[in-house]
Structures are given as C-alpha cells and as structure tokens.
UniProtKB/Swiss-Prot annotation:
This is 1-deoxy-D-xylulose-5-phosphate synthase. Catalyzes the acyloin condensation reaction between C atoms 2 and 3 of pyruvate and glyceraldehyde 3-phosphate to yield 1-deoxy-D-xylulose-5-phosphate (DXP). Mg(2+) binds at residues 146, 176. It comes from Burkholderia ambifaria (strain MC40-6). The keyword Metal-binding applies. PANTHER family: 1-D-DEOXYXYLULOSE 5-PHOSPHATE SYNTHASE-RELATED, 1-DEOXY-D-XYLULOSE-5-PHOSPHATE SYNTHASE, CHLOROPLASTIC. GO terms for cellular component: cytosol. Gene3D superfamilies: 3.40.50.920, 3.40.50.970. It comes from the Bacteria. GO terms for biological process: 1-deoxy-D-xylulose 5-phosphate biosynthetic process; isopentenyl diphosphate biosynthetic process, methylerythritol 4-phosphate pathway; terpenoid biosynthetic process; thiamine biosynthetic process. Binds 1 Mg(2+) ion per subunit. Belongs to the transketolase family. DXPS subfamily.
C-alpha cells in the first residue's frame, strides 16, 4: 500500500517520477489524506480536491526555490505529505504535532503562514517583487479559492500586481464551486494550452507592436481576442487587472495541468490560471456533501460520518442561534449578518425562517461591519455573528464606521478564547483588549448558556455598539430560560464569599469562561469569587468593595492579559484609591499552539488547579507571607 507515496520524501523525489506514474501517485495520495484525516479529524473536502493540483505544482516548479502560497491554508495536507511530513500526519492538529495550516517554522516549503483568507496574492506579489530586487530568478505562486476571491484584499493585490509587468507571478484560482466558469471541456483545455504557450504570448506582443501605429485596428484585434476568450471563460475581468488569463482547465486532469504550468513557467509578468476542482474528489460521500465533510472529527471512511447523539449540553453557538430566532420572531427589525460562516455561527435555522432578514456577505468582514452600521442608521437592529479571530479583520470599520457614530450594532463574538485544533491563527485571544479601548463600546463575557442568552438580549436593547463574547463548544449544562431578562448595565455578581480571617482573604474577579474554574479554585482556597460579567463598563463599585474587604485580588480571563479585562479592574482599583496586591491571570504574551483546549488552558494555568496554584504561590505560601511582611515594614 502507498508504494509510490512511500518513495516521496520531498518534491525532488516527485520530479524524478515518470509522468505516467503521477496519476497512480495521486490515487495513493488521496487515499492517504482520507485515511489520515479520518484518524485525527481535520479539513477533508478541500484537501481531496487539491491532490492533482498539488502534485502538478511541485512537479513543474522548483520548490522551495519557487514559492507557493496557499490561501486560507486548510487545503495543504497533500502539500505537507509531499514535502517531508508524510510520517507526521498522525499528529496533525494534535498537541505538539504538525499544524493544519502552512507554517514557516515547520518547513521551508511553507513559504508563508496562512489561515485567514484572501492574503495569498499580496504575499506572493511581495515575494515576486522581492525576488526581482534581489536578482533571484524564481516564480511566486498564489493558490486561492473562488470564495476567497470575493474579499477586497484579493482584488487590491490583483490591482497592484497587474502593473508589475516583469514579476514572475502566477495566481491560480481554485474554483471548486463552478461559481465563475462554465463546464470544462476539450475546447477549454485546448484554449488553455494555446493561451499559456510562448507562441501566443509572443504573437500577441508582436501584433500589438505592429498595430500600435493604427489604434483603431489594434482595438478591433483586442475585441476579437476578448470575444474568443469570452465564448468559454469570463477572462475580461482578470485581463483588465493586467493579468494574462488562462483557462479554465480541469484541476483533476494532470495531462492538462502539467503542460499548462510548464508553458506558464516560461512566461514573465502576472499570469492567472483558472482551474476547476471538486471538493471531496474521489470520496463519494464528501463529493455528495462537501459541507458535512469540510472539517469532520474522527470517523470510519467505510461508513462515513454518523449523526452524533444529541449532546446533553447545548453549544454556545446553538444558544446564539436560538436566541436570534426568538428575537426575530418578536421584532421585525432584527437582522442577521454573517461573513460566510452560516453553519459555524449557528444561523442555519435563522436563514430558513427569516430569509429576507438574513445576509451572508461572503468573506468580507470589513463590509459586514459597515453594512451593519448602515442598517442601524435606518432603524434596524443588526446582529453581526462573527468569530473573534475574524473581527480583527474589520477593526477600522468597528472604530470608524460603527463606534465613532455610536450606532446600535450587536456583535455576537463566537470562538472567544482558545479554540483547540485550529491553533494560534484562529484563537480569540485579543477581542477584549482591542475592543475595550474603543469609546462607546459595551462588552460582556458570558459564563454559561443562560447568561449568554440574556446578555445577547441585553445587547439588543442598547443604544450603542455592544459585544457579547462566548467560547466554542458545549456550555456548562445550565438550562436557558425562555423569558428574557435584561442584565443591569455594568453590574457583576458575587458567586461565592470567603470565610477566611483578615490577612488571608482573596477575591477572584472572573470573566466569562473563567468563572467555573475560578469557583473551583475558590472552593479549594476558600476565596471570594465574582462573576464580573461586563468588561466595559467594568463594575468599578464591585471592584472597590472587594478591594476594601479583601487582602488580595486576582483577575482571571480567557484572553490576553495586556490591555484586557484584568487591566480594566486594575484601572478601576487605581481610581478607587484602594491599594491591594493584584495578580492578573490570562493568556500569556505568546501565540498558543494547537491542541486540546482543556490541556492548553491547564498549560496556561487557567484551570481550577492552575488558578489555585498561582494564588497559593503568590499570596498564601510561607514565602509569600515573609515577602508581604517585608513590604508592610518597608
């Protein structure tokens, strides 16, 4: 099994194969991807769809000297397997294992780290221009999907690249939804080879030189050329950006891909190759339902993904989806917006029931936020369902278009905190810090399912931009209450009181997901625990009261410490004039790798045992007593 694949330790081995061996290799590679993902979980449909394209790129181009940038990056498992990581695939997305995305520190073949969409053309153009300036003769290649091509950044890069006439840049549009092109056929293949050939490029340049003295004739020739292309492909748009458009071609046909790429390799200037692929190619279950098989957990390939038993605990995403439908039922002004994350954000049912108030704007986070602002000016109640990591992409719009104008937009921020297998690129570590400094913002962090529901309802009542953050995955098991209750603005609650004598009294000020582990630490240490609820406005009165009645304060959040919720508490403490020793616990000043979320939180000292350990070492150990007494004497 995998007789050919076992001989490939790097692309140099691949390039030594006979062309006739490449399709059997593709079959083995596809089977290996399926087997690997079924054992570890991960992205499947997109990787099954890029097998032949990956083989062709590494076969034709001299990687890693020639650079390949994979947009989004979740389709790079075949690339990883062919570039020396075949025997590490068992550790894919596991703690201390290889990443599910390209990572420069992992391999020289991962030329640029990706995970968010639409960045590849900008990066590849920078590489192409950089190579020119360095006097290096290498190709830079961006592989981008048709979904990612909807984002403005991709077109900004295309606009810039089109005037770089000598750059050895190739943009490959991996069209896996047939959303742009007509069906692929023999005529398309023939035209693609013709357009990528040196004769065509030279002939076109020669004709333009000859006809430059007769502009009307030249314009006629250009129109005829566009018409010829337009019969089979929508080339005009990409040609207008200054690219030579080639395709579409079948992205699973190595006999089309390889000669076309070989022709392109001999050209200079920006080239645009349109390939059509099928998500889930070669695995019928994934072909039939590429969404279901987009990012599965472990499963049996022979049986396929089986329906999971209904979990005892709702996920926070489900809580959001149910809340949104309930609010929309009550109020016709409620509008739901998602940047291409309908399933992930829990909006499937909302789309079915309120189709005229559901807007999937595509991979366009900046537009989503400003679009919501526009809706708010017309008296509607827009709710933007967005992952924490993707809200980063719309920071200027959050400030300039929504907060500056104090528009009542609700931001339902999913995947707050650590997200597990997707790793640092998708961690929701920074939203509290980057939102807290924005005037007019109200920010809440949910500690359980019902609190999440009531916070979302509270947010919808506010006259200003308001955010509610909640984590990925299952909740704590708390039942949601159908009736809505508005939470008093900027008010936390004490969930546990200490019985310790003076000198040993510790108060833990916990935010969101950190309330549960803080309560565990509070039980172990007999400490007071407060559920702060609001990051902005922070409950300054509660901070002061806890400072006045306790000897030590500890803030705990599942977000970056610098500038986060703990900083808000310390600022309130300074304002109060009550001075107490404070520990700020949260995510450290580093990017947290992929792995099991519970294990990662424990590694960061943010489980119950870790919180108790930090408090004990800092405030309650004999050494801490000595240090504290020394400070008091001083």
């Amino acid at each position: 099994m995998y007789d050919l694949l076992k001989t490939i330790d790097d692309p140099a081995d691949l390039r030594r194969l006979d062309r006739r061996q490449l399709q059997p290799l593709a079959d083995e590679l596809r089977a290996f991807v399926l087997d690997s993902v079924s054992k570890t979980g991960g992205h499947l449909s997109s990787n099954l769809g890029t097998v032949e394209l990956t083989i062709a790129l590494h076969y034709v181009f001299n990687t890693p000297n020639d650079r390949i940038v994979w947009d989004v990056g979740h389709q790079t498992y075949p690339h990883k397997i062919l570039t020396g990581r075949r025997d590490q695939m068992h550790s894919l997305r596991q703690y201390d294992g290889i990443s599910g995305f390209p990572r420069r520190s992992e391999s020289e073949y991962d030329t640029f780290g990706t995970a968010h969409s639409s960045t590849s053309i900008s990066a590849a153009l920078g590489m192409a221009i950089g190579s020119q300036l360095n006097g290096d003769d290498r190709f830079s290649i961006a592989v981008i999907g048709d979904g990612a091509m909807t984002a403005g950044m991709a077109f900004e890069a295309m606009n810039n690249a089109g005037v770089s006439e000598d750059a050895k840049l190739l943009v490959i549009l991996n069209d896996n939804d047939m959303s742009i092109s007509p069906p692929v056929g023999a005529l398309n293949r023939h035209l693609a080879r013709l357009m990528s050939g040196r004769f065509y490029a030279a002939a076109r340049a020669g004709v333009e030189r000859v006809l430059s003295v007769a502009p009307p004739v030249l314009e006629l020739a250009r129109k005829l050329e566009e018409h010829a292309k337009g019969m089979v492909v929508p080339a005009t748009l990409f040609e207008e950006f200054g690219f030579n458009y080639i395709g579409p071609i079948d992205g699973h046909d190595l006999d089309s891909l390889i000669p076309t790429l070989q022709n392109i390799r001999e050209l200079r200037g920006p080239q645009f190759l349109h390939v059509v692929t099928k998500k889930g190619q070669g695995y019928k279950l994934a072909e039939a339902d590429p969404v279901l098989y987009h990012g599965p957990g472990k499963f049996n390939p022979a049986e396929g993904i089986k329906p999971s038993p209904t979990p005892a605990k709702k996920t926070y995403t489900q809580v959001f989806g149910e809340w949104l439908c309930d609010e929309a039922e009550r109020d016709s002004r409620v509008v739901g917006i998602t940047p291409a994350m309908r399933e992930g954000s829990g909006m499937v049912e909302f789309e079915k029931r309120f189709k005229d108030r559901y807007y999937d704007v595509g991979i366009a986070e900046q537009h989503a936020v400003t679009f919501a602002g526009g809706l708010a000016t017309e008296g509607l109640k827009p709710v933007v369902a967005i992952y924490s990591t993707f809200l980063q992409r719309a920071y200027d719009q959050l400030i300039h278009d929504v907060a500056l104008q104090n528009l009542p937009v609700v931001f339902a921020i999913d995947r707050a905190g650590l997200v597990g297998a997707d790793g640092a690129t998708h961690a929701g570590a920074y939203d509290l810090a980057f939102m807290r400094c924005i005037p007019n913002m109200t920010i809440m962090a949910a500690s359980d399912e019902n609190e999440c529901r009531q916070m979302l309802h509270t947010a919808l009542q506010q006259p200003n931009p308001t955010a509610v953050r909640y984590p990925r995955g299952a909740g704590t098991g708390v039942a949601t209450v159908k009736e809505f209750t508005e939470i008093p603005l900027g008010k936390g609650e004490v969930r546990r009181r200490t019985s310790q004598p003076e000198g040993k009294r510790v108060a833990i000020l916990a935010f969101g997901t950190m309330v549960a582990p803080s309560l565990a630490a509070g039980e172990e240490l007999d400490a007071t625990v407060a559920n702060m609820r609001f990051v902005k406005p922070v409950d300054a009165a509660l901070v002061r009261e806890l400072a006045e009645t306790h000897d030590y304060l500890v803030t705990v959040e599942e977000g970056c410490v610098m500038g986060g919720a703990g900083s808000a508490c310390v600022e309130a403490l300074m304002e109060s004039g009550v001075i107490r020793p404070v520990i700020q616990l949260g995510l450290p000043d580093q990017f947290i790798d992929h792995g099991d979320p519970a294990k990662l939180l424990a590694q960061c000292g943010l489980d119950g045992a870790g919180i108790a350990k930090s408090i004990r070492e800092r405030f309650l150990s004999p050494a801490a007593d000595v240090a504290d007494q020394a400070k008091r004497v001083a």
